[in-house]
Amino acid sequence: YMIVIPAKNRAFNIKCDDGDSMKLETLQKLVGGPIEPVHTLLEPGWAREKDVDGILLLVNEEGRLKGLPENPRAEEMVSYAAPAHAKLVGPAIVAAGRGEEIIGFAKPVAETICAEWL
């Protein structure tokens, strides 16, 4: 599962459509354009998976250019060490990073992250 954080509505879990990941086309459809990974404040241990390097937000790379609405809940998850991403806009997807892979979470893990962070 991955977690979708819309700019205006409640966050929700979505089942991965490609094994433990999602197809690029699905991710792009969910954020409304090309995806850009942004590191979050969450430690890799939140994923409860082996070899996870970090927890990521996937956002629309062109979101600011398109004038998408700000997403304050997504902003709260972002490391303040990355000032270029201080204002996140549009929908965001929470996923785990494992090397070059972007993977989802087990359902209970996604539910815990939603409950604790969103």
Q: Which role does the model predict for each range below?
A:
Residues 1-118:
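Short beta-rich binding modules
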